[in-house]
């Protein structure tokens, strides 16, 4: 038996000569849809003395991730060289698709594709495809929307662009997309649990941005329990909101900001409360506040009572495990007053006691 004419080709050659052209022929573009060598996990950090390095064996990297649009993933494609069967990469493709929360997995050795469709839209889980039978972006997106059960209104919100900024990690993508999708579908209480150091504030920013830009949520309140969290959030992750955003306070100091080049500047924050009259300027769309600043003294309580109970469409509570779900909590006063707003709780450690339950309040 003669060797396959592709047998001398490397996996990279197979991708370049057969898989990528098949994707492009089906309408997938490098600019919008295709990401090669997509890192899901960079690998564990191994420390030896003063030196450290990434353990490449624990790295997870998909050969291709296909997107409906930037940051809205649809499918994973795993490649193997021609010495392997067409479907040899499917176990990896399924693993990566599950991490990304997408239902479509493909495997290829350059001779064709094996397509695994977890939506079971036509009752078939896996099928073989020739190179020229790869689904178009529109076909996969239609299957995806039908699988999700989205109406056109929900689809509009779920497909709203991310704010231009750093590339989110795969777990941030999952948290952002699933939260936006849940709220678009009508869920009004969401508990978002992310480990310390995984970028909760950046994740919250992208959720708020997409809900705001889609028009689903027009007036938003972000609550935290420390001034530094509010101030640094305003000059860093929430910086793209500048002009539409203000601190719900009559006073603030200049905030130090270090940019990507290491340059230090002092920035003044826009304030929503008049220092003399304590009257709130309601012309802003994004408000950030310490919970103490709106539920402390009677004068401070009057600040949030200046808003009608239906003023805010969305409230995001940072570090909600600090007691926001307790019946006698200061934050709970705010959440109860603005009960008609969609409410998101952010935490690294959900609080579950006989008296306080973040899960009971926000849901799982």
Describe the residue ranges of each PLM region.
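Short gly/ser/thr-rich secondary-structure transition/capping motifs
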Residues: 249-251, 262-271, 295-301, 325-326
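Short beta-alpha junctions and helix-cap segments that line functional grooves
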Residues: 89-93, 207, 236, 274-275, ...
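Short acidic low-complexity segments
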Residues: 256, 267-280
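Signature of the SF2 helicase/ATPase Hel1-core->accessory helical subdomain module
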Residues: 292-303, 307-364
């Amino acid at each position: 038996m003669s060797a396959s004419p592709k047998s001398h080709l490397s996996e990279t050659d197979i991708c370049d000569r057969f898989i990528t052209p098949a994707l492009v022929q089906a309408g997938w573009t490098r600019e919008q849809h295709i990401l090669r060598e997509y890192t899901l996990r960079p690998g564990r950090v191994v420390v030896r003395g003063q030196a450290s390095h990434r353990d490449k064996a624990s790295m997870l990297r998909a050969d291709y991730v296909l997107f409906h649009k930037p940051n809205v993933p649809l499918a994973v494609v795993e490649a193997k060289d021609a010495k392997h069967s067409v479907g040899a990469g499917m176990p990896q493709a399924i693993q990566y698709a599950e991490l990304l929360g997408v239902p479509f997995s493909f495997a290829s050795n350059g001779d064709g594709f094996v397509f695994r469709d977890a939506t079971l839209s036509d009752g078939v889980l896996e099928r073989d495809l020739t190179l020229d039978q790869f689904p178009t972006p529109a076909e996969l997106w239609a299957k995806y929307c039908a699988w999700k059960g989205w109406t056109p209104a929900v689809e509009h919100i779920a497909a709203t662009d991310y704010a231009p900024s750093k590339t989110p990690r795969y777990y941030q993508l999952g948290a952002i997309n699933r939260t936006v999708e849940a709220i678009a579908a009508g869920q009004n209480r969401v508990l978002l649990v992310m480990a310390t150091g995984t970028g909760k504030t950046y994740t919250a920013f992208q959720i708020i941005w997409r809900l705001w830009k889609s028009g689903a949520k027009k007036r938003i309140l972000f609550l935290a329990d420390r001034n530094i969290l509010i101030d640094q959030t305003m000059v860093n992750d929430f910086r793209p909101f500048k002009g539409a955003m203000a601190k719900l306070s009559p006073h603030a100091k200049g905030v130090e900001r270090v940019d990507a080049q290491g340059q230090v500047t002092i920035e003044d924050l826009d304030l929503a409360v008049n220092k003399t009259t304590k009257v709130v300027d309601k012309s802003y769309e994004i408000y950030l506040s310490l919970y103490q600043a709106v539920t402390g003294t009677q004068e401070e309580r009057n600040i949030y009572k200046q808003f009608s109970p239906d003023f805010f469409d969305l409230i995001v509570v940072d570090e909600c495990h600090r007691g926001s779900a307790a019946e006698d909590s200061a934050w709970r006063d705010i959440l109860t007053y603005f009960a008609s707003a969609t409410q998101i709780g952010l935490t690294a450690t959900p609080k579950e006691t006989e008296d306080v339950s973040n899960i009971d309040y926000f849901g799982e």
